[in-house]
Amino acid sequence: MGRVLACHGSIDRFSEGEPIRALGIFLFAGQLGTLLEQTGWVARVVLLMLLAFSLFSWALIFQKSRMFSRMNHQTALFLRIFRSNKFLPEPKQMGSGGSPLEPVYSAGYREVDSQLRAGNPHGKVTSLNAVTVSMQLAAAEEVRRAEKYMPWLATTGSVTPFIGLFGTVWGVMDAFTGLGAAGAASLRAVAPGIAEALITTAAGLFTAVPAVIAYNHFLHNIKDLGSRMDGFTLEVAAMIEKLYPGQRM
């Protein structure tokens, strides 16, 4: 019975602590709002700039995450279909248009088809190098498409800390100005300037850190994509070598 009462008491203490924590969060939010109201126009401009950088960066992060997730799924499906065929299937039969391997394969298939239709008497692929180059060009285009807007993340990660640092310096200058106007050292005189400095510093870091992490993660995905397309190009070239043996340039 005593153990039950002890458990009951701990539950009561836990339930009583929840409103206290909620009240603490509410008070912190209220204090943050008060600090923002006390900031000057320079700090507000800095915060608005950082907010714009942050919003666009997060939108780009979500868009890139969905894009790479879809690419990985469609690429796995595309490779499974391709490897299940003993001959070169037509691109429209692959049924996986969301994979970056699809335009790479289509470029190689068109080059093979054009060589077979060129009227050579033996119906052979005369230049395997031309097929490989056409696929490599298509792969380079897909890499460029995957790299779209990546410089924005790099710029956000490198520039926003300095924007926040500018707000920090301005806030410290404002604090010294308030201290000089008050004529005596007091917390009330320096609080607005210190608040500006701390808020802009935190905002700059909050904007820069996710952008840098996302940039490095997506850069790794792009390098992996390039490696997979290079490997797929060699795989297609090897299949063409088996299907159309003979003298080539």
Please provide the spans of the model-predicted regions:
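Predominantly long cytosolic amphipathic alpha-helical stalk/bundle segments
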Residues: M71-F166, V172-S186, I213-M249
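Short, strongly hydrophobic alpha-helical membrane anchors
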Residues: G2-T39, S186
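Residue-level signature of catalytic and energy-coupling elements of molecular machines
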Residues: G40, W58, P91, Y105, ...
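N-terminal membrane-entry
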Residues: R44-L47, E147-A154, E196, T200
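Transmembrane alpha-helix/interfacial motif
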Residues: T39-P91
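Hydrophobic alpha-helical transmembrane segments and adjacent short intramembrane/lumenal linkers
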Residues: G183, R188-A197
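Residue-level signal for the membrane-embedded core of alpha-helical transmembrane segments
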Residues: V46-M49, F53-F56, T160-I163, G167-W170, ...
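Hydrophobic alpha-helical transmembrane segments of polytopic membrane proteins
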Residues: A197-A211
